[in-house]
Structures are given as C-alpha cells and as structure tokens.
C-alpha cells in the first residue's frame, strides 16, 4: 500500500498520525471504505474494501482529515459555487444513493458519481484522483476550477506540496 506521500507534504504529515486497519467497517449501518477522525488524527480503513479503489480511497479519506483541519481554506460555499446553478448536493453523504466510484470519462463538473453527494465528498474525490494520478483525459471547465481550488488550498497550507 502506498500513500504516495513522499516529500514535505506538511499538511498531511501534521494532520495524520495513525492509520487503523479493520474489516467490515460501517457507519450508520452502511458499509464504508474509511472513516477519518481529524481530532485524533486517525484514519480507520476497511482492508476488505474493493481492491480496485483501495489506494484512491486512502487519499480520499486523508483529504477529509486535511479538510476538517482547514475548513477556512476549503470552503464548501466557494466550492459549490463552481457547479451549475441547477445542481444541489445532498444534505449528507449517507442521504443519497450516489455512491459510484468509477471515474467518469465525461466529467461535466464531477469526477465520479460519489462526488455528486456532498461538497466535501466532491473535494475528497478530486484530491484522491490528483494524488492517485488518474484524472480523466478530458477535463471540463467546472472540474478544472475544482482542481485549481484544491491545488491552491494545499499550497496555502504547504508551499512545497507537490501534486
């Protein structure tokens, strides 16, 4: 397993101290790949989760810890303003059936179906694809704004952050 966190990515090193590996992880009765706890700087990960997405899920959950530590930098209202006026996120990630993790080839502002659930999940999906190096080949203007927002936020935390 590789987090790909080589170098001086201070925002990650300072935000994450422990990774707990477990099986059959769930929250509110719903199976989940991981649960971030920014207070304890801990990431709980289900090692039985779909291997196809496992490393990307690690990056996704790491972003939640970063996001929770730097809410003022990763503002959800600013993020939501990038979307078309007709789009609204769900109230919570477990309040929607949008759970698909396959990367879209036609993005239309979103990188996966799950990224349409909430603003924080959308940010985490963009970050995970950046870290994992599997962005779609064609990126639309909305998704490009989101990518630039994540990169800019990370550089505000750590000027040496390298994606």
Task: Walk through the language-model features, giving the residues of each.
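Short, small-residue-biased leader/transition segments that mark boundaries at the very start
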Residues: 1-12
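Active-site-flanking segments in enzyme catalytic domains
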Residues: 17-163
């Amino acid at each position: 397993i590789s987090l790909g966190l080589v170098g001086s990515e201070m925002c990650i090193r300072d935000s994450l101290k422990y990774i707990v590996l477990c099986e059959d992880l769930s929250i509110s009765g719903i199976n989940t790949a991981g649960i971030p706890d920014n207070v304890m700087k801990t990431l709980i990960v289900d090692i039985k989760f779909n291997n196809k997405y496992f490393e990307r899920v690690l990056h996704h959950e790491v972003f939640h810890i970063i996001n929770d530590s730097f809410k003022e930098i990763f503002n959800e209202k600013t993020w939501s303003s990038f979307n078309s006026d007709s789009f609204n996120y769900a109230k919570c990630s477990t309040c929607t059936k949008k759970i698909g993790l396959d990367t879209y080839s036609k993005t239309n502002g979103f990188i996966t179906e799950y990224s349409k659930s909430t603003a924080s999940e959308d940010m985490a999906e963009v970050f995970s694809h950046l870290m994992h190096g599997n962005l779609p080949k064609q990126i639309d203007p909305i998704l490009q704004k989101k990518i630039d927002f994540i990169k800019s936020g990370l550089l505000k935390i750590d000027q040496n952050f390298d994606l």
